[in-house]
Amino acid sequence: MRVENHSPSLSKLNPPEAGSGDPTAIGRRLSGIRRAPLPHVSAGSDGEAAAAGKIGAFLRKAVAAQSYGLMFANGKLFEATGDALEKRGQYGFSALQRLDGLSRRNLAAVEARLGALDSAERGLKERIMTGAWHFRHQSNAALDDGKTAAIASNHLLARESRSSGGNTFAGDKALLSNHDFVFFGVEFSGRGKQDKPLNHKHSTMDFGANAYVVPDTLPACRHGYLTLTDHFFNRVPGGREAEHQDFVGSFPQMGAETGRWIHEGKYRQNAPIFNYRDMKAAVALHLIEFLRDSKDAAFKAYVFDQAMQSGQALDRVLNSVFQAEFHIPRLMATTDYAKHPLRPMLLKEAVDSVNLPALSGLVSSKGDAVTAMWHAIDKGKDAVAAHLLGNWRFEAGDFASAPPGFYHELNYALSEHGASVYILDQFLSRGWAAVNAPFEHVNSGETMLDNAVKYGNREMAAALIKHGADRNLLSEWNGGKLDALLA
């Protein structure tokens, strides 16, 4: 994925209709906005700095409205709970008002359940609300250039046709439609961004070898929202599922209690969401609610003693009782970040994420390059294949058999569902694959043209015919379908 490194720009800005009187009208007409850190303004130009700050704040708010509009108007959950917005092409600031209303309602719900807090609980709430948080995005992709980190949402990447894959699935999009946000785990310790994160997993998942850490004071965070769990699968992993087994093992009763769904209302998947203003109070009050319900006296004593004094202890508590997830609208672009390698990256991960700098460091022999090419074939990664073709000399014999871990022969892999036509064309052009060679294992006797027809891949079928594929070799199931596919 390439890194965007430019100042905010508008590819299209339609002015509000004359006499509309709607201050949010311009926000609804914004489209094609890209954001990056504003250019540096010298200390002597205070007026310019103030103006630039106001423009940047407005653009962030306008973009955030589109992200929330997409979520609230299209997520089936919000329709079920009566919180949906009307679908439209562009969204005004009412989308942000919807977030604020939900946040207030969810905060009021836990406040009502708790009633008055005692002095120890008030102290704990104050401790959490005054603490400095950091947000952690884990990935295998190359998301920075050493000076600027630019992390885009799934929606933005797809719109610009530069996605290298991700962790947003059809179920997330259908239920929540929150794929125009960048997702982060939360570090509660108060340590600086330059300190290595204390947590390397989120809801039991390892999302990448590198962590990009930003402070909660970042302007891009101000229109974000927080959930106490993974927003889609809003269950806290408990006991043996928890990341920090040494900590959870010290409080077995607490470990048994943490594995739970956190939701408001009758729908189990209705994870409460909180805006930036309310998020710290929400975490504090939900922790107090958990403590009141807990039967683990030792854990409660630890919270009101050790966690009040130690940032690391507080982080262990909050990342065991919750798995908080923070969401920044559309794009997080900043120079105020730190990158932390958490573990060595695997070759497969570098290919899957199209991280060419990391791939170059991992491929030190022709054998490595061949394995990387098989991964590129398997995942349809054109950029990786082009990189390898430009840096290594291959022969047909290099691909005669698949490396360990790959289960399809070359011809089948090159024409499998989702395979890259570019990579197929490169292999056929170089004579590394025989266009009419029958499969020997899966669907024995069929050819690559059968796969192209079976999967309805017109572009692949045309490429195969260009390279001499014999339609007479098509199986009886596919023989009559080729002309219709090519029509």
Swiss-Prot record:
Coiled-coil regions, chain positions: none
MF GO annotations: ADP-riboxanase activity; calmodulin binding; toxin activity
Residue numbers binding ADP-D-ribose: S139, L143, A152, N154, L157, G166, N167, T168, F183, F207, D230
Catalytic machinery residues: E325
UniProt key word Electron transport: no
Listed EC numbers: 4.3.99.-
Catalyzed reactions: L-arginyl-[protein] + NAD(+) = ADP-riboxanated L-argininyl-[protein] + nicotinamide + NH4(+) + H(+)
Primary enzyme class: lyase
Matches recorded under Pfam families: Ank_3, Shigella_OspC
Binding-site list for NAD(+): H137, Q138, S139, L143, A150, A152, N154, L157, N167, F183, H202, D230, E325
Mutagenesis / variant outcome for changing R159A: Abolished interaction with host calmodulin. Abolished interaction with host calmodulin
Compartment(s) of residence: Secreted; Host cytoplasm
Annotated effect of mutating L59A: Abolished interaction with host calmodulin
GO BP terms: symbiont-mediated perturbation of host programmed cell death
Reported effect, R330A: Abolished interaction with host calmodulin. Abolished interaction with host calmodulin
UniProt effect for mutating Y455A: Abolished interaction with host CASP7. Strongly reduced interaction with host CASP3
UniProt record similarity statement: Belongs to the OspC family.
Described purpose of this protein according to its UniProt entry: ADP-riboxanase effector that inhibits host cell programmed cell death. Acts by mediating arginine ADP-riboxanation of host caspases (CASP3, CASP7, CASP8 and CASP9), blocking their processing and activation. ADP-riboxanation of host apoptotic caspases (CASP3, CASP7, CASP8 and CASP9) prevents their activation, thereby inhibiting host cell apoptosis. ADP-riboxanation of host CASP8 also inhibits host cell necroptosis. ADP-riboxanation of host CASP3 also abolishes pyroptosis by preventing its ability to cleave GSDME.
Protein name: Arginine ADP-riboxanase CopC
Organism: Chromobacterium violaceum (strain ATCC 12472 / DSM 30191 / JCM 1249 / CCUG 213 / NBRC 12614 / NCIMB 9131 / NCTC 9757 / MK)
Gene transcribed to yield this protein: copC
